[in-house]
């Protein structure tokens, strides 16, 4: 898996993966124009959409309605070091479901790659490289 993130100016970035593009920005109080989600919001979105995928797969497998299903994700900011903590995920599925199906949806959501990555922190390496530029072109 790979994404590229390019600085557009100010505190704005363009994120690309395959043929998809997402804008990342900051609200005005952080020097941005609020034209895209912030990095922490993108993390919450990643977790929520991943959990939603697994919940939808469970519903589909059991021939249950998945229209209108929503996932809400919240987290709190923590300091020292700066990070997010106390993630809370709520899966809202329209209609009435048995306790077994609610448990099944929860178990399916626990298969989410992002959820499991956050629960089992990966090793992260960081490298800084100098690149030569000719105008806007990298050479």
Predicted segments with their positions:
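Extended beta-strand/beta-hairpin segments
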Residues: 1-45, 55-139
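Alpha-helical metal-binding/catalytic segments enriched in His/Glu/Asp
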Residues: 50-51
């Amino acid at each position: 898996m790979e994404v590229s993130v390019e600085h557009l100016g100010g505190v704005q970035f363009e994120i690309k993966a395959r043929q998809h593009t997402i804008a990342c920005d900051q609200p005005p109080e952080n020097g941005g124009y609020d034209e895209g989600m912030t990095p922490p919001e993108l993390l919450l979105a990643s977790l929520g959409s991943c959990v939603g995928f697994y919940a939808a797969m469970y519903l589909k497998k059991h021939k249950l309605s998945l229209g209108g299903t929503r996932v809400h994700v919240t987290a709190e900011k923590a300091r020292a070091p700066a990070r997010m903590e106390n993630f809370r995920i709520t899966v809202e599925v329209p209609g009435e479901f048995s306790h077994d199906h609610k448990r099944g949806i929860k178990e399916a959501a626990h298969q989410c790659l992002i959820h499991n990555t956050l629960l089992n922190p990966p090793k992260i390496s960081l490298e800084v490289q100098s690149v030569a530029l000719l105008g806007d072109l990298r050479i």
